[in-house]
Amino acid sequence: MRFLIPEGSRVLELGCGSGRLLAEVKPTLGVGVDFSPAMIETARRNHPQLTFVQCDVESPEEMANVEGQFDYIVLSDTIGSLEDCQVTFENLHRFCTTETRIIVAYYDQLWGPLLRLAEITGRKMPTEQQNWLETGDIVNLLELADFEIVKRDWRQLIPRAWLGLGSLVNRYIAPFPGIRRLCLRNYVVARSLKALDHRELSVSVVIPARNEKGNIEPAVNRLPKFGSHQEIIFVEGHSQDGTLDEMRRVQSLYPELDIKVMVQDGKGKGDAVRKGFDTAGGEVLMILDADLTMPPEDLPKFYEAIASGKAEFVNGSRLVYPMEEGAMRFLNHIANETFSLLFTWLLNQRFTDTLCGTKVLLKSDYQKISANRRYFGDFDPFGDFDLIFGAAKLNLKVAEVPIRYASRTYGETQISRFRHGWLLLRMVLFAFRKLKALD
């Protein structure tokens, strides 16, 4: 749960018990609700920095005593004792913003007999008759209540202390496909559809470029107008073909456009993207590769996905439509397919093309990714996975926009297939350790 909820969040827990879990996630605003007066008294005594309310979470009248909106709403094992899960979910919308995440955690139905045996033998606290819901049941109830599933996860294959191997098995074996469906704990993360609305947003298009002189003016000419304001940011990467001079020429040639030109301080696309994003003034941040193999004409689709609220992180995909001949080398294509399967599993959201350069998100979400970058560290020279992993850590809703990948018309690829392939393999292992092999 501490992985899903960043420290300093506003958290509402329904069925908080003694308040232990709520205190562990270290919220700036923590509100716990429970129907048991004894539990509420214990929680208030143990965690005076948090707020606890004694009421029935299924009663709208009693829940009126809880005010405000929250970043996370947690139901940990609570759905097992609810009379009507769907109605309870429906009553949560008033606590939700567009950024709120509902987290439902529960024991898997498969473990029911063993848990009852543990109660009989005194190894687990007895509970009343439970709703033994499968993950699919929880997903269905949330969708009926107008919530959209962001991702699902499964944890804890065996008790931690079992023969001293519990932690090892749970970290390094339990997350694998097939095995994970046998885990004790299910997690479903969802967001409110009722909180979504279409907004007109300003846009910053960041174009990192190294030795792309012939693509600078076409990038400006081919970029459609969309958003309440459009800013174009060229970030030059120490080129040797006059790219920087061409950027300045184009900036002077189109004074009616908001064009900015800067030179990156370090090396690599990731460094260039971070410099551009940190400078950007738009509410929506976009990456457009200067080779223009991703058609600039497709960017309004990415914008619409963000502005409509349908997605919070939009990734391009070159692997859906047929490509132009020579647009992608065979080995690159195989690598993309392989890494896409791996990252779909690692991130619990669908990714068909992690290496597509075009990625779009709100600046407010990017700032959260940047603030939490210490969790992953400075590991990614590409910049793609810094954003993808950060979005996964924030539980952002991901969508992919298929694009028709075109051949280069100027310059040569900046990608060294084998060196970058080795780095990508290292990132898979890194992601497994940071996203799957959790304590």
Regions found by a protein language model. Name each.
Residues 111-131, 264-279, 296-377, 381, ...:
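Acceptor/aglycone-binding surface of glycosyltransferases and processive sugar-polymer synthases
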Residues 86-98:
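A short glycine-rich, Lys/Arg-flanked "PGG" loop and its adjoining helix->strand segment in the class I
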Residues 53, 244-279:
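Conserved donor nucleotide-binding strand/loop of the catalytic core
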Residues 236-245:
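A conserved acidic beta->alpha catalytic loop
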Residues 285:
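Short aromatic/hydrophobic "clamp" motif used to bind/position activated sugar donors
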